Amino acid sequence: MHALKRTLFGLFSSALLVASAANAACLGEQSSTKVYTFDVVPQHTAAKIYTTWSPLLQRVGQEAGLCFELRVAATIPEFEQKLLKGEPEFVFLNPYHAVLANQKKKYQPLLADSEDLLTGILVVRADSPIKSLDELKGKNISLPAPNAFAASLLIRAEMAKRKIDINPVFVKTHSNVYRSVIGKDAIAGGGVNYTLDNEVPEVRQQLRVLFESQAYTPHPVATHPSVPAAARERFLKAMLKLTQDEEGRKLLDGINLSKPQAVTYAKHYKPLESLHLEKFLVLTGQ
């Protein structure tokens, strides 16, 4: 009963956070005459994204003299439609989304984590007898979305390279992937290193990593070409300044951006073009 009460309280608190964030005029400097849209790829639930990003954007916005409207699409495909139409002004997106956004709308990456590189993983239940990727042939594999970079595109490309046919089942979020494997709805699932690390111990303990991909520069914050260089620079400086105090470091840890660094498309994301992942893309609504 106590556990149920705690769960209900947590859900209620998250709902309040979502509602308050959604109803706020903007996050950051309230006197700013310009409100920038800030979209976050929905790898997690909207409640979790609002809980972690809202306080960070509030502080960064105040420091930088900027104000943001935090937006979270219901699904990754919906997020992609908005991105490839050029709607978000600031956006936190996966590395291959950064490639597409640069090619389609000239978005420029601004900063990303410098230490925790991104890897795609395939997980199975901890008690699964499966030892090799070959054993997944013809099986249902949970993936968050068709165009999730490390959790889907890299996994499907790796399986295709090995000539292992799988049945991908798209379940919207990384959290859903891990739980579908635990619940035996799929024999394996695709995720990324840090979303598994962020799961509660009860989930992590029931899973085993079967495969891990090469490491890549992780998700960046990128900006639409309409965002002035001065606004980009103020945002970057404010984000880097968060590393200087404990509260700021906790905010960065919450979004898996503990050691932010300035990044460029040419150096950090253009090399992904050579992976030729476009053959695995599924784009809708364009």
Give the role of each language-model region.
Residues 26-95:
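Extracytoplasmic small-molecule ligand-binding "clamshell" domains
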Residues 77-91, 104-105, 134, 175-190, ...:
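Short helices/loops that flank or line small-molecule/ion binding pockets
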